[in-house]
Amino acid sequence: EFTPAQMFELVDRCEDYPQFLPWCGGADVHQRTDTVTAATLHINYHGIKAHFSTENTKRWPNEMDLRLTDGPFTHLDGHWRFTPLGDTACKVEFSLHYQFSSKLLEKVLGPVFNHIANTFVDSFVKRAAQVYPRA
């Protein structure tokens, strides 16, 4: 339904996340070039607040790697892949690996992050339908 370039653009525009991700309370872009986007995402979900920063290495329009630069984790890394399916569609894949920096944070934020990871791709596909209406 949507091209790799369209989906890549939605993922890269993290400043738009608060418009369609209910858990996202804000986003600050620190740097954006053709190959890197560095940003901080603010989580505000059912009264739980946290933030984390990543540096995302971009290979337009097919891949993006996320690497933690700051936040309540010992590590966090992720990978987006946008694989073309014909001329006008793509397969969207997202993987996220993380470990919280304490058991308490894991207990509080773990369910929130599980929810985020499990609904992330679907949220972007729904957003694409709003941003790129079909002719």
Which positions does each model-derived feature cover?
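Hydrophobic ligand-binding cavity/cleft-lining segments
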Residues: 1-34, 130, 134
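Short strand-connecting beta-turns/loops that link adjacent beta-strands
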Residues: 3, 32-35, 61, 85-89
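Soluble, non-transmembrane catalytic domains of enzymes that act on hydrophobic metabolites at membranes
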Residues: 4, 23, 28-31, 36-40, ...
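Short, surface-exposed helix/turn micro-motifs that flank interaction/cofactor sites
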Residues: 8-12, 83, 125
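Short amphipathic alpha-helical signal-transduction/dimerization elements
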Residues: 15, 113, 117, 121, ...
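Glycine-rich portal/gate segments that line the openings of hydrophobic small-molecule binding cavities
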Residues: 18, 28-70, 123, 127
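Beta-strand/loop substructures that line and gate deep hydrophobic ligand-binding cavities in soluble
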Residues: 68-119
